């Protein structure tokens, strides 16, 4: 039967993405169920959306921006000859969204903080939920997320209590600093962090109460290295080890 969603927040694309993310009662990650089809309709009451805490909108913005960064996963660029047409389509849409986020994100969060419904708010709501969900759909739920989102899952798993106060996109953005470095673009981390800072986001694991010298950080590294997003080569192990520093070094 047809199904629909009525999201009251634009903090994630969960309402339209063809998957269900699961957690334990304690809040640790429990994996995802993936579906062949998304819901039939999404109805958003924009009078509700424009009055949500701007932190939710900012988190959804960072989650949306993550798509372009994570689709690259280890590549310095995405070329049609190298990837499936579905993933190339996902990247093209994600790249468009990234540029709109750069242009309109701050205005949208400012307007939401004032409870005003503006074009910027409508644009960002559409990107956060519909477009991010489409990116997930055209890539069949695989390939549009990688190390940034996997870092989120592992932080929820290994540092469950520390992660509890923080939103999905806030932790994903920290993981995407690692992702940028792994993609071969460490020079992009500083401007990306500047954008995070301008959105009042935490920048590092320390900012969300995690000790980067904790023994559990090695568990996080090993789980990332043995994740489906990583070919287990010596070269990738060295690249990932180096990229891990960007989870904490500000």
Where are these regions (language model features)?
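A glycine/threonine-rich phosphate-anchoring loop and its flanking beta-alpha core
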Residues: 2-90
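Short alpha-helical scaffolding segments that buttress acidic/His motifs in well-ordered protein cores
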Residues: 65-69, 121-135, 176, 196, ...
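Generic structural signal for hydrophobic core residues of well-folded globular domains
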Residues: 68, 72, 155-159, 179-183, ...
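A short secondary-structure junction motif
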Residues: 68, 72-76, 108, 131, ...
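Intrinsically disordered or highly flexible coil/loop and linker segments, enriched in small
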Residues: 74, 78, 110-114, 134-141, ...
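C-terminal charged capping/lid subdomain of soluble metabolic enzymes
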Residues: 77, 185-250
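Active-site segments that bind and position negatively charged phosphate/pyrophosphate groups
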Residues: 81-195
């Amino acid at each position: 039967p047809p199904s629909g969603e009525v999201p009251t927040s634009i903090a994630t694309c969960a309402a339209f993405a063809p998957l269900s993310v699961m957690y334990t009662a304690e809040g640790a990650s429990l994996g995802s169920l993936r579906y062949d089809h998304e819901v039939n309709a999404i109805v958003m009451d924009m009078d509700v959306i424009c009055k949500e805490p701007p932190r939710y909108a900012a988190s959804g913005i960072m989650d949306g921006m993550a798509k372009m960064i994570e689709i690259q996963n280890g590549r310095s660029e995405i070329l049609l000859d190298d990837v499936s047409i579905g993933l190339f389509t996902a990247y093209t849409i994600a790249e468009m969204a990234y540029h709109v986020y750069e242009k309109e994100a701050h205005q949208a969060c400012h307007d939401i903080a004032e409870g005003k419904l503006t074009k910027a708010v409508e644009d960002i709501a559409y990107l956060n939920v519909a477009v991010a969900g489409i990116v997930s759909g055209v890539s069949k739920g695989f390939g549009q997320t990688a190390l940034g989102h996997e870092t989120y899952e592992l932080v929820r798993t290994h540092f469950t209590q520390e992660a509890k106060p923080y939103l999905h996109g806030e932790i994903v953005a920290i993981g995407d600093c690692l992702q940028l470095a792994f993609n071969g673009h460490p020079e992009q981390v500083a401007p990306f962090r500047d954008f995070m800072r301008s959105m009042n986001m935490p920048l590092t694991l320390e900012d969300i109460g995690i000790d980067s010298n904790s023994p559990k950080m090695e568990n996080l590294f090993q789980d990332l290295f043995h994740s489906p997003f990583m070919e287990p080569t010596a070269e990738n192990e060295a690249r990932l080890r180096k990229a891990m520093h960007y989870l904490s070094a500000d």
